[in-house]
């Protein structure tokens, strides 16, 4: 399962967030409330990775685990989390969500600009800050041409983003396994894009899993280029599953490196739980938060 498979359900209004009785039982087994965290890392979780829970149940779960943010929600989902006092740490637009059709192709600019011009004021009005975007796949477009296309299109929405205090964040994906042909698949490419756009309201969503797969050198990359990174995602390598000792990344050291940069934004868990038992899936999120709470 990956995020692309969840996009269609989001557009249909379900977001894939249905709750089975077994999931409910597992959810109710968690008795801890307001687990004290150290406060050096602001934690979040990507909604699509816990899609066996209803969104309001996921809100209650994250509060029981001691944090108060959820990633990757569209405007129609915000009222649900607002009722629970939960923050949307990374927003979608209300329109078409495509990881493969993005800013690197001028033929997409008209609908993208329309969607983002509508979404930016909504994000600001809701009290949120981050709005995700995607480069799109190459589809034969040269990387340099694609970058210039991104610059041309994104600059048309930057004044509005700056006016509203919204940060547009392009996600870095690996093209080796999960997102073949995706253009923004190297941190160097994304960093150069940030430099060309030249606004504090455009940054990169540095996905630790994706960049470990595509290029490695995670801690050094963060230390050297943290000013271009506005958000972080986690998952284990290989497999995109739990971030425990079954995979190769040592997340406590990565989190310490992030905290040492002075970063005050969110780190969102985006691993796909490998266990089929819902109680174990919830336990995995609890464990991941503890691992990252340095």
What are these regions (language model features)?
Residues 10-12, 16-19, 35-37, 104-203, ...:
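Active-site acidic/histidine proton-transfer and metal-coordination neighborhood
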Residues 78-92, 150, 166:
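Short acidic, glycine/proline-enriched helix-loop-strand junctions
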Residues 49-51, 74-76, 94-96, 137-139, ...:
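Active-site-proximal loop/turn and secondary-structure-junction residues that shape catalytic pockets
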Residues 58-77:
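Catalytic domains of carbohydrate-active enzymes, especially glycoside hydrolases
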């Amino acid at each position: 399962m990956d995020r692309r498979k969840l996009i269609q359900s989001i557009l249909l209004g379900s977001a894939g967030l249905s709750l089975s009785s077994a999931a409910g039982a597992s959810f109710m087994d968690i008795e801890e409330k307001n687990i004290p965290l150290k406060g050096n890392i602001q934690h979040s979780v990507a909604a699509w990775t816990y899609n066996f829970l209803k969104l309001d149940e996921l809100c209650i779960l994250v509060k029981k685990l001691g944090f108060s943010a959820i990633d990757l929600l569209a405007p129609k989902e915000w009222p649900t989390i607002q009722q629970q006092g939960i923050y949307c740490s990374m927003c979608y637009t209300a329109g078409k969500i495509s990881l493969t059709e993005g800013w690197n192709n001028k033929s997409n600019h008209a609908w993208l600009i329309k969607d983002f011009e509508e979404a930016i004021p909504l994000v600001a009005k809701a009290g949120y800050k981050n709005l995700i975007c995607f480069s799109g796949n190459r589809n034969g477009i040269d990387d340099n041409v694609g970058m210039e296309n991104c610059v041309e299109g994104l600059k048309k929405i930057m004044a509005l983003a700056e006016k509203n205090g919204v940060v547009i964040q392009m996600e870095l994906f690996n093209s080796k396994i999960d997102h073949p042909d995706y253009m923004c698949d190297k941190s160097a490419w994304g960093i150069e894009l940030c430099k060309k756009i030249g606004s504090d309201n455009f940054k990169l969503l540095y996905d630790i899993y994706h960049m470990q797969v595509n290029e490695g050198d995670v801690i050094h990359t963060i230390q050297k280029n943290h000013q271009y990174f506005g958000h972080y995602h986690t998952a284990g390598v290989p497999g995109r599953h739990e971030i425990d000792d079954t995979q190769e990344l040592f997340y406590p050291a990565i989190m310490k490196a992030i905290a040492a940069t002075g970063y005050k934004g969110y780190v969102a868990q985006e691993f796909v739980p490998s266990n089929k038992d819902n109680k174990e899936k919830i336990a995995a999120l609890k464990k991941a938060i503890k691992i990252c709470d340095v």
